[in-house]
């Protein structure tokens, strides 16, 4: 892979890249400390931490237009963009629960919708490209950014790019303006659909049925979708066939279920995938259906809504909410969700060890009760695997839900659904692989005691906000997912062999070699491997810095890319709490390696050379 300069998107020349090049240890520190020599060179960043430039530009234009009618200075105002009014309202509630009174009293929401009196806008109606902007004083931005980062509810860069063009052309306008306009002849935009069954007539008289998140349209609306697709290509230069969006969602869901072979990706064929019976799957749950799988704009959004759903169905009106349990050292925002979106907070077991599980059992035996237990399998970055068999036994006995994040293990290597009520995953990672689109997934176990209540919550409360362009990219990227996993598994084991016996390596973290290997083996599929994520701690910081600076891979945030990606993960994820992380055995100088598809011999040489540089550095005092 060619070297990346500081701040370059990874992959290079990719408008919607998910990672960014931080090629030296000092660049990572500079990023965390907000130093200009790093921040000003960043073309992009990881989307939940770095707001994409296209989103920033759109927000600035909304603010400029809005304040021109309010006699305020643009420099005093900022905006955060969300796909729907409901989500924007949740962000406002979050800000008002934390921000000073002068900030809270000056928050507004501007909802931009299609001006359906314009014939061009009517052609875009099936896309429903809405935007809700939370406009606030600059002092409110840090609170809005917390919501954006933790929840994953923000707009995607592709949605923002498309909607910004409509806004500039006058096709997307504030709903308050349109309410006062004479638009009675226009068809209303239905807005993001909820995952529910319903039959209705649209404003044009065509019957439509929404079943399990898929819209089945009459002939008139099918023709409209075809017209919209032609219009998108002619007017905006976008080759986006909307007739493929719903089959693409179906294909993604079936891949997640393990019910679709890699070769089955002809979305233009006869009956759509959503209309076929899902006859078998690799999850070991015979009654699992496609409609038990939900797609989200990113993985953290899947976790956020899993928690939101369980909180809702298990917290009767007027009752004190139950705490959740975070078992094992988690990805940074998972714990933040459990702590910040539940007034009762969370019980945190950072080691995820047998003694932690013993302590939890003691608490349960003494009468303590919990909303849900959230865990990763394996954990990030230590690759520790919780004892899912025992956790399931405790959950059944003491009635709490189990949510397992399978992002790192992947369903091609492990089967965790049998022990979970909900399984979540970041599709942004190895499922996509191309590092150019975000996505998340959640599976409801149909055998869960909470299944019916969860389905009811979804039908009433969950909005489908996964932008169609992102869906199309995710479906295309994921077609060869299983084959890529096999290659990554083999490459990861080869790199482990290079690291395992090297004198500079203090600790190697990988499911095959960790103390918790038995827990991994309990759910490992017969054809599965141990995944593509490795963490390593060298003998000292000096050696870690030398190794990182010398390694000839892409270097930046994220994981699960088709190319090897290296990161001083703890610096990036926990820079403000390094001492806290070390209490749980997470070394501040840990280096995380996401293994890619390069040739095995090539990777062995790359890691051998970097270790040699680190070795030479250790010769100097």
From Swiss-Prot:
Keywords: Amino-acid biosynthesis, Methionine biosynthesis, Pyridoxal phosphate, Transferase. Pathway: Amino-acid biosynthesis; L-methionine biosynthesis via de novo pathway; L-cystathionine from O-succinyl-L-homoserine: step 1/1. Transmembrane segments: none annotated. The modification N6-(pyridoxal phosphate)lysine is found at residue 429. It catalyses: O-succinyl-L-homoserine + L-cysteine = L,L-cystathionine + succinate + H(+). InterPro entries: Cys/Met-Metab_PyrdxlP-dep_enz, PyrdxlP-dep_Trfase, PyrdxlP-dep_Trfase_major, PyrdxlP-dep_Trfase_small, Trans-sulfuration_enzymes. It is an enzyme of class 2 (transferase). SUPFAM superfamilies: PLP-dependent transferases. GO terms for biological process: methionine biosynthetic process; transsulfuration. GO terms for molecular function: cystathionine gamma-synthase activity; pyridoxal phosphate binding. Its EC number is 2.5.1.48. Its cofactor is pyridoxal 5'-phosphate. Both met-3 and met-7 are required to form a functional cystathionine gamma-synthase. Belongs to the trans-sulfuration enzymes family. MET7 subfamily. Catalyzes the formation of L-cystathionine from O-succinyl-L-homoserine (OSHS) and L-cysteine, via a gamma-replacement reaction. In the absence of thiol, catalyzes gamma-elimination to form 2-oxobutanoate, succinate and ammonia. This is Cystathionine gamma-synthase. It comes from Neurospora crassa (strain ATCC 24698 / 74-OR23-1A / CBS 708.71 / DSM 1257 / FGSC 987).
